[in-house]
Regions:
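C-terminal motif of bacterial Sec signal peptides marking the signal peptidase cleavage site
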Residues: 18-21
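A residue-level marker of the well-folded mature domains of exported/periplasmic proteins
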Residues: 23-405
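Bacterial N-terminal signal peptides that target proteins for export
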Residues: 1-11
């Protein structure tokens, strides 16, 4: 019957396939040195893949190249966090030596090293209207955290963070506030604040000791509470070491107008200030230029930089810089994000936490060694809680370095 013959053919073919398969299995068995089957070994685990982590950053209008606030934030993400440096419009690997040379001695033991897998994504803001769309663009690109650099991004960070609760955000220099101005927190937003008044106090104390005509100057950017902390600390520091000194105070009204900074700097030097401290973002580059030109013309004047060590801009003119370690705040957030430890809330960094300090004093002036010793004594008192630094000029005692515009 056709059905029986078909069944027989299927049976024969199946048997042949089975024999062939068994033979191949025997041939495929690994053998030991004596020709015997090798003993079974545990499977080799594949090397773990480096977890990719995109971290985004939105600058304020000062942007990259301000040699100050934004550049400090970029250093914390790009160099310290990712081990990268920007060159020719693209990232290149930075050497360990390049990272090390940006760390002051007090940071050498904090274990700062690139975080494996971090890729920076940076968007520069030309106008304030760029802040919110830039932050949202970072979220759309899949970043694990979006960083808003500066208090001017507060509203944008708040809006985008509420819209995207699964994305982490880092806000520098501001807390979130409700409609009544009361601070509050979101679970996906870390705010990093600094005790600028403490670092400003130290450079003010140094300015008071370095001044020869008892007249120093302060240049602020926008006249807002944040910059008032710089002014208050500086004036208190001057008064602590040189009660006879007068502090000339002026504001440029911006953070991105180098020409305005230079004009105000020239004005203060003309009025007799021989040490000028600026807290004015990119405007401060103009202040430094004004003092540099005054020194070239024979005037014994100094300038004090801010946020980053600005001595490279005018080595002979920069007395020191008040270091506000935005880079440290950014780096610690990147590290915590990678370790799954980033939580919402406010973090404040002062002298005790390494968040503020002053740069090495590379220039010479009479009494330098004694001046630095005095400044360090004042630092110790602040860290120990024995000396409280005012956070607003209204808190200064009546006798403390009266300000003149």
């Amino acid at each position: 019957m056709p059905t029986s013959r078909h069944a027989l053919r299927v049976s024969l073919v199946s048997g042949l396939l089975l024999v062939s398969a068994c033979k191949k299995q025997e041939e495929a068995k690994p053998e030991g040195a004596a020709g015997k089957p090798a003993e079974a070994t545990a499977p080799v685990a594949a090397a773990p893949k480096e977890k990719a982590l995109k971290v985004g950053l939105v600058t304020d209008v000062g942007g990259r190249g301000d040699h100050s606030f934004n550049d400090s934030a970029l250093r914390g993400l790009e160099l310290w966090g990712a081990g990268k440096k920007m060159g020719g419009g693209s990232y290149k690997d930075a050497s360990p030596e390049e990272l090390k040379e940006t760390l002051q001695q007090d940071l050498a033991t904090r274990g700062i090293a690139p975080v494996a897998g971090v890729t920076p994504v940076v968007l520069q803001s030309k106008v304030p209207e760029d802040y919110e769309p830039n932050l949202q663009l970072l979220v759309d690109q899949g970043v694990g955290m979006a960083i808003g650099v500066g208090f001017m991004l507060e509203n944008a960070v708040e809006t985008v963070a509420k819209r995207n609760p699964d994305t982490k955000f880092l806000l520098i220099d501001s807390t979130l506030a409700d409609a009544e101005g009361k601070p509050y927190t979101l679970p996906n937003v870390r705010s990093v604040l600094f005790r600028e008044e403490q670092g400003s106090f130290l450079v003010g104390a140094l300015a008071g000791l370095a001044s020869k005509n008892n007249k120093v100057g302060f240049v602020g950017g926008m006249e807002v509470p944040l910059i008032k902390r710089f002014e208050a600390g500086f004036r208190a520091g001057v008064a602590a070491t040189n009660p006879k000194a007068t502090v000339l105070v002026n504001y440029t009204g911006s953070f991105d107008n180098v020409a305005a900074g230079k004009q105000v700097g020239q004005d203060l030097v003309t009025k007799g200030a021989d040490v000028v401290y600026h807290a004015a973002g990119s405007d401060g580059m103009g202040v430094i230029q004004a003092v540099k030109e005054a020194r070239a013309a024979g005037k014994p004047v100094f300038v004090i930089g801010v946020d980053s060590d600005q001595s490279h801009l005018a080595p002979e003119a920069v007395l020191t810089s008040m270091l506000k370690r935005v880079d440290l705040g950014v780096y610690e957030a990147v590290r915590d994000l990678a370790q799954g430890k980033l939580e919402g809330g406010d973090v404040t960094l002062g002298l005790k936490e390494g968040g503020v300090t002053y740069a090495p004093v590379r220039v010479e002036f009479p009494g330098k060694a004694e001046a630095l010793q005095k400044v360090e004594e004042l630092r110790a008192k602040i860290v120990a809680g024995e000396l409280q630094v005012p956070t607003h000029p209204s808190q200064l005692p009546a006798a403390a370095a009266p300000a003149q515009k």
